[in-house]
C-alpha cells in the first residue's frame, strides 16, 4: 500500500492481535482487537454490563473506513446501551455483542474501494450519524429525517470503545491539530447536537441578541450550548444544580446563572387547578422572575435548550416567550413529559424535537473548533481499564463539569501527534 510520505515511519511487527496502546504497522489490519463489549444477558450497570473481550476487526464495505481509535468520548448513550433502557441496542442490530461509543479521534487505517476523500494516515474525528444515502432525505432533504438514519455506537454494534472502529466515510471530519487526542475525542457528539438544536430549526434558528435558557449548563451539552450562544452574539442563561459550577458556566460566556436548587418546581406537573398546582405555579413564576433579573423585566427567553426532560419540561414550556421554542434532544431525568397546554396554544409556542446533526451541521460545528473559537471543555480522562467506571460516574451524575474521554491507543494524555504516541509508547 502506498502511504503518504508525511506519515511517521516506524517499525512494528505484524500480528493477529495487539495489546491496547501497542501500535501496528501503518495500514496493517490485524484479525482481532480488544473491545468493551455489552451482551444482552449482561444488561445492567455499566461496571457489570461492559466487559473487555477479544473480537474480530470489522470488515469494510466499499464506502467504509477503518479508524484506529486513539481516544474515545463518553456519552450518556453508553449508559443507556449498558442498561438496555429505554431500549436494548440488540433490538435494532441483532448482533451477539454491542460495542458502545459514539465519539472518537483517531487515524484512518484502511479504506473501502470507493472512498476517495480520505486516505490511510489521515487524522480524524468522527460524527455519529449514519444512513444508507439512497433516499430523498439523504439527497436534497435532511439526512436526519431519513428512514435509515441511525446513531453509530448506539444503534449500530461497532462503536468507538475498541481499538478499531468501522464508520462510513461521510462520518469523518478533520481533527483539530491543536487539541490532544483525548480533547479531540470528547466533543463531536455533544457539540453537533447543540449546534443543530440552536441553528437547525428555522425560523426559530438562533439570532444575535436573543435569550436562551440552557439546562445542565455545566455538562457536555450545556457547555457547548453556552459557547455557541455566546459566539452567535446571543445571551445564554445557564441553569446549574451545584453552586460550585457557577463560575465555570460564567467563564464559558453565560450572561447569568441560576441554581435550580433555589426553586421547587421540578418533576411532573401537578393536576391543574389543585392546591399542588398553585404551589408549583408560585415557584415557576419565581423562577421566571429570576430569569427577568438577567434578561430584563418582562423579557422571557426566545428559546429553551432542553434535555433533562421530565423534571424540567413543565417549567420550560412556561418560561418560553410568546412564539418562542422549546427544543429538546433527550430525557435524562425521565421520558414522561407534562405541561400546561394553555400556555402552549394561547402563547403559540413551538415544541421541537432535535436529534444529533447531519454532516453539514456537524462540519460547521467542527469548523468552529478547528478555528479555535470553542473550548472542548474536557473535564476528565480515564484509562482504557477504567472505561466502565467513567460510565458509572456519568450515570450517578458524579462527573466533573464538561466532557469525558477514555484513552484507547494513545498511551498517555497530552499527546497531539502520531509521533508523540509512538515516542510515549516506547
Which residues make up each language-model segment?
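C-terminal hydrophobic helical "lid"/dimerization subdomain
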Residues: 2-31, 314-317, 359-426
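NAD(P)H dinucleotide-binding glycine-rich loop of Rossmann-like/cofactor-binding domains
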Residues: 54, 80, 102, 130-216, ...
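Glycine-rich beta-strand-centered segment in the early N-terminal region that forms part
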Residues: 56-74, 86-139, 171, 176-178
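Hydrophobic/small residue at the entry helix of a nucleotide-binding pocket
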Residues: 193, 220-221, 311
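Adenosine-nucleotide cofactor-binding segment
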Residues: 214, 230-311
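N-terminal Rossmann NAD(P)H-binding glycine-rich loop of SDR-like oxidoreductase domains
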Residues: 218, 226
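Glycine-rich phosphate-binding loop and adjacent beta-alpha segment
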Residues: 232, 240, 249-250, 269-273, ...
Amino acid at each position: 500500500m502506498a502511504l503518504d510520505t508525511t506519515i511517521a515511519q516506524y517499525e512494528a511487527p505484524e500480528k493477529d492481535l495487539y495489546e491496547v496502546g501497542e501500535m501496528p504497522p501503518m495500514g496493517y489490519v490485524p484479525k482481532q482487537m480488544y473491545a468493551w463489549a455489552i451482551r444482552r444477558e449482561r444488561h445492567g450497570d455499566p461496571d457489570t454490563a461492559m466487559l473487555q473481550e477479544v473480537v474480530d476487526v470489522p470488515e469494510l464495505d466499499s464506502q467504509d473506513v477503518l479508524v484506529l481509535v486513539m481516544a474515545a468520548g463518553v456519552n450518556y448513550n453508553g449508559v443507556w446501551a449498558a442498561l438496555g433502557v429505554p431500549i436494548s441496542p440488540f433490538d435494532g442490530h441483532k448482533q451477539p455483542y454491542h460495542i458502545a461509543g459514539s465519539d472518537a479521534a483517531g487515524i484512518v487505517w484502511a479504506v473501502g474501494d470507493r472512498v476517495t476523500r480520505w486516505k490511510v494516515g489521515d487524522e480524524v474525528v468522527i460524527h455519529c450519524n449514519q444512513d444508507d444515502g439512497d433516499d430523498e432525505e439523504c439527497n436534497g432533504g435532511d439526512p436526519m429525517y431519513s428512514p435509515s438514519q441511525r446513531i453509530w455506537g448506539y444503534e449500530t454494534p461497532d462503536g468507538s470503545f475498541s481499538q478499531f472502529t468501522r464508520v462510513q466515510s461521510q462520518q469523518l471530519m478533520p481533527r483539530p491539530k491543536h487539541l490532544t487526542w483525548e480533547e479531540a475525542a470528547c466533543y463531536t457528539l455533544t457539540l453537533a447536537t447543540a449546534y443543530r438544536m440552536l441553528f437547525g430549526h428555522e425560523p426559530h434558528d438562533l439570532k444575535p441578541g436573543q435569550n436562551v435558557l440552557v439546562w445542565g449548563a455545566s455538562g457536555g451539552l450545556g457547555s457547548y450550548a453556552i459557547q455557541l450562544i455566546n459566539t452567535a452574539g446571543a445571551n445564554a442563561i445557564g441553569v446549574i444544580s451545584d453552586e460550585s459550577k457557577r463560575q465555570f458556566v460564567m467563564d464559558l460566556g453565560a450572561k447569568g446563572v441560576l441554581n435550580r436548587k433555589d426553586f421547587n418546581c421540578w418533576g411532573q406537573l401537578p393536576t391543574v387547578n389543585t392546591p399542588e398546582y398553585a404551589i408549583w405555579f408560585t415557584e415557576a413564576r419565581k423562577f421566571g422572575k429570576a430569569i427577568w433579573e438577567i434578561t430584563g423585566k418582562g423579557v422571557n427567553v426566545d428559546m429553551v435548550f432542553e434535555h433533562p426532560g421530565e423534571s424540567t419540561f413543565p417549567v420550560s414550556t412556561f418560561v418560553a416567550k410568546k412564539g418562542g421554542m422549546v427544543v429538546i434532544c433527550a430525557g435524562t431525568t425521565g421520558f414522561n413529559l407534562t405541561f400546561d397546554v394553555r400556555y402552549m396554544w394561547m402563547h403559540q409556542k413551538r415544541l421541537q424535537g432535535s436529534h444529533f446533526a447531519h454532516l453539514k451541521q456537524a462540519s460547521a460545528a467542527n469548523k468552529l473548533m478547528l478555528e479555535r473559537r470553542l473550548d472542548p471543555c474536557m473535564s476528565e480522562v480515564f484509562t482504557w481499564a477504567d472505561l466502565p467506571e467513567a460510565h458509572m460516574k456519568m450515570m450517578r451524575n458524579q462527573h466533573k463539569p464538561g466532557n469525558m474521554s477514555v484513552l484507547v491507543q494513545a498511551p498517555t494524555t497530552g499527546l497531539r501527534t502520531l509521533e508523540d504516541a509512538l515516542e510515549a509508547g516506547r
